[in-house]
A protein has these predicted regions:
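Active-site helix-to-loop segments that bind/position phosphate- or nucleotide-bearing substrates
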Residues: 4-95
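Internal, well-folded beta-alpha domain core
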Residues: 93-246, 251-256
Length: 256
């Protein structure tokens, strides 16, 4: 089983990691993207990414100083511990023990505009490059064309190695799209979380993001590897709804 997550814009490098580390699979492709971004002035970055002048300058500096990370340093640390934001508030990777992190390293994958795909312990430098960015490269007019089928093949090979067909989608549409059209024999499961508000159960964006992280945390802590066990998810008062669920979309409801 593989679980895919989106990354986060908020990063935190102010921590010490006692975990092992690994190296991203597509560093040569990341370097090509950085070489492209290094040619752009802050005003170009601001326009391309819709950033303030301050954020554009910060990321200009990041691109200029970027190099492939192969050892831990002040600005090179394991990806799942660096990412903050709603999903990672739910995940709370800093609380995972070594056994849980080992499970996460095998089963969790973070989709990334710059790195393509990251394992939890893959070393990552600070960056900003969302998957939906219309960055033109020699491969095409956006990052989906740049990555092509590389990320999909990586995930399919991981599933093959695990003798599994189960892909848990806890990523946003923007990021999951990089996986392209998956083979029909891959069982894609997309958990959905709804909260009771104004007389109805509905998806609330902030909670939905945090809940994806909660689901990932629960899977890691319980070392879940099959679809049937997902219905047991019960963190933060969520309960599985058989009535609202389908074969590929398990629905979890929470009443305040």
């Amino acid at each position: 089983m593989i679980i895919v997550l989106s990354p986060a814009k908020t990063l935190d490098y102010e921590f010490e990691s006692n975990h092992d580390h690994s190296v991203p699979a597509f560093l040569s492709q990341s370097s090509k993207l950085i070489d492209n971004l290094k040619t752009k002035e802050p005003k170009d970055i601001a326009s391309l990414m819709g950033l303030s002048d301050k954020l554009a300058t910060l990321n200009f500096d990041r691109y200029q100083s970027w190099s492939p990370a192969k050892k831990v340093s002040a600005d090179s640390k394991p990806s799942m511990l660096v990412f903050k934001g709603d999903v990672y508030q739910g995940l709370q990777a800093e609380d995972l023990n070594n056994s849980q992190m080992k499970f996460a390293q095998k089963h969790i994958r973070i989709l990334s505009g710059l790195y393509g795909i990251l394992r939890p312990l893959d070393l990552m430098k600070p960056y900003r490059l969302e998957m939906g960015t219309k960055l033109e490269t020699s491969e095409g007019k956006n990052l989906y064309e740049f990555w092509g089928d590389k990320v999909q093949k990586n995930v399919l090979n991981e599933l093959k190695d695990q003798k599994s067909d189960l892909l848990i989608n806890l990523a946003s549409k923007e990021y999951f799209t990089v996986l392209g059209k998956l083979p029909e024999d891959i069982n894609v499961i997309t958990p959905t979380f709804k909260d009771y508000k104004n007389g109805n159960y509905k998806i609330i964006s902030y909670y939905a993001k945090k809940d994806r992280g909660l689901m990932a945390k629960w899977i890691i802590q319980n070392k879940v590897t099959n679809f049937e066990d997902l219905s047991g998810f019960d963190l933060d008062r969520y309960k599985y709804s058989k009535a609202e669920s389908t074969a590929t979309v398990p629905v979890f409801l929470r009443k305040s």
